[in-house]
């Protein structure tokens, strides 16, 4: 389903109908995809926090927030305002420079990773040819910020939390990259746009989840571990480490960790949607929709419809995965640190490597199904 370039053309044609030049119409169009991504990130965090509170309450037979707005929808905003007015404390013997730089180094790579997240054929900030490689590189920076925060706090619990975060990230980054490499091998491209386009043509049957079920499971497990969600929240296990690397943080510095965690969760869900669930692709091919409405496939109405549906489908698939992640957090026990590392090194790493080799063999044997 092509939901970007034709939408831009239709938008420009509408503006030119009001007497604007094509250059001015193009300039007006340029910030819209960026605005969509920024708004999606901010609204996504607010919605996810509200869902987290409501789903956790349901899992524990509680009501959850209900007084701050209808059904408690304003509770995330109240949480943000509370953190905003809290005192920003730096421990007396902490390294103030590293202590301040740590949360920034955690949040910035996650936000930059949104550069390569497409909501449509042209609805992304930057269609770089190495989008997947860029995301893996950026995600490798975050553990440095976590370790820096733990070390700079001059607190034994914070240091242990930072060390755990670094060990956990290294353990799960490799199988995650190998599972993504299998997708890249089938697509012959590192571009997220190309990966989604490769899954179009036959609706839901074209999705990579059917050709890469093992890779999908490995990627999702590793993504949860990278987000430090239960059962993989060892770096901030409250029963053992108080709050891990966050122990000495308060106010807006703590809010940066909080914000980065939820943005990373949404980003991971969006990437699973893009890599394995067809991205903005609708389960029904656009040709069938156009034929049912007795309209040509390049009609402006069809293009606007498919673009709108594409955005909705991308967000819907992502939030289905967010729901699963939240449910797992509140219904599963935490694993031990040795179990966490064993799962990454002894199971996920060899399985992801075998999956990559099998994918290469299937591509040679059946190029029409696994990319030629």
Curated annotation (Swiss-Prot):
Tell me, in a sentence or two, what this protein's role is. Answer: NDH-1 shuttles electrons from an unknown electron donor, via FMN and iron-sulfur (Fe-S) centers, to quinones in the respiratory and/or the photosynthetic chain. The immediate electron acceptor for the enzyme in this species is believed to be plastoquinone. Couples the redox reaction to proton translocation, and thus conserves the redox energy in a proton gradient.
- Membrane topology per the record? Multi-pass membrane protein
Q: Name one GO molecular function term.
A: oxidoreductase activity, acting on NAD(P)H, quinone or similar compound as acceptor
Keyword set, alphabetical order: Membrane, NAD, NADP, Plastoquinone, Quinone, Thylakoid, Translocase, Transmembrane, Transmembrane helix
> What protein does this entry describe?
NAD(P)H-quinone oxidoreductase subunit 1
Subcellular location as annotated:
Cellular thylakoid membrane
Which Enzyme Commission numbers does its entry carry?
7.1.1.-
Q: What does the subunit section of this Swiss-Prot or TrEMBL entry state?
A: NDH-1 is composed of at least 11 different subunits.
Q: What class of enzyme is it?
A: translocase
State the family named in the UniProt similarity comment for this chain.
Belongs to the complex I subunit 1 family.
First-listed, main subcellular location of the protein, grouped into a coarse class: membrane
CC annotations in GO: plasma membrane-derived thylakoid membrane
- Which PROSITE patterns does its entry note? COMPLEX1_ND1_1, COMPLEX1_ND1_2
Record's superkingdom?
Answer: Bacteria
TM segments? 27-47, 97-117, 128-148, 176-196, 204-224, 266-286, 308-328, 347-367
Pfam families named among the record's database cross-references: NADHdh
């Amino acid at each position: 389903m092509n939901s970007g370039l034709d939408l831009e053309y239709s938008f420009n044609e509408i503006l030119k109908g009001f007497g604007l030049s094509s250059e001015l119409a193009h300039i007006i169009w340029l910030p819209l995809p960026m605005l969509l991504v920024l708004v999606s990130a901010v609204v996504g965090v607010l919605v996810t926090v509200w869902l987290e509170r409501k789903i956790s309450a349901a899992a524990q037979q509680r009501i959850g927030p209900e007084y701050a707005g209808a059904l408690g929808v304003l509770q995330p905003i109240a949480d943000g305002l509370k953190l905003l007015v809290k005192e920003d404390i730096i421990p007396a013997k902490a390294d103030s420079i590293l202590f301040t730089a740590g949360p920034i180094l955690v949040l910035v790579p996650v936000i930059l990773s949104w550069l390569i997240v497409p909501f449509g054929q042209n609805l992304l900030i930057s269609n770089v040819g190495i989008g997947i490689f860029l995301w893996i590189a950026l995600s490798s920076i975050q553990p440095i910020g976590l370790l820096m925060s733990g070390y700079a706090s001059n607190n034994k619990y914070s240091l242990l939390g930072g060390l755990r975060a670094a060990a956990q990230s290294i353990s799960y980054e490799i199988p995650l990259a190998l599972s993504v490499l299998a997708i890249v091998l089938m697509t012959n491209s590192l571009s997220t746009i190309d990966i989604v386009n490769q899954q179009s043509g036959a609706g839901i049957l074209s999705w990579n989840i059917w050709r890469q079920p093992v890779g999908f499971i490995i990627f999702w497990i590793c993504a949860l571990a990278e987000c430090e969600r239960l059962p993989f929240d060892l770096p901030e296990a409250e029963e053992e480490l108080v709050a891990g690397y966050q122990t000495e943080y308060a106010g807006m510095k703590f809010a940066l960790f909080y914000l980065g965690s939820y943005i990373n969760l949404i980003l991971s869900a969006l990437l699973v949607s893009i890599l394995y669930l067809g991205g903005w692709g609708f389960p029904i091919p656009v040709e069938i929709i156009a034929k049912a409405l007795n309209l040509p496939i390049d009609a402006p109405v069809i293009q606007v419809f498919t673009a709108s549906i594409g955005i909705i489908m991308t967000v819907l698939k992502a939030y289905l995965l967010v729901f699963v992640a939240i449910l797992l957090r509140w219904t599963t026990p935490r694993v031990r640190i040795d179990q966490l590392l064993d799962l990454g090194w002894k199971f996920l790493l060899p399985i992801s490597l075998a999956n990559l080799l099998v994918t290469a063999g299937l591509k040679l044997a059946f190029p029409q199904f696994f990319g030629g």
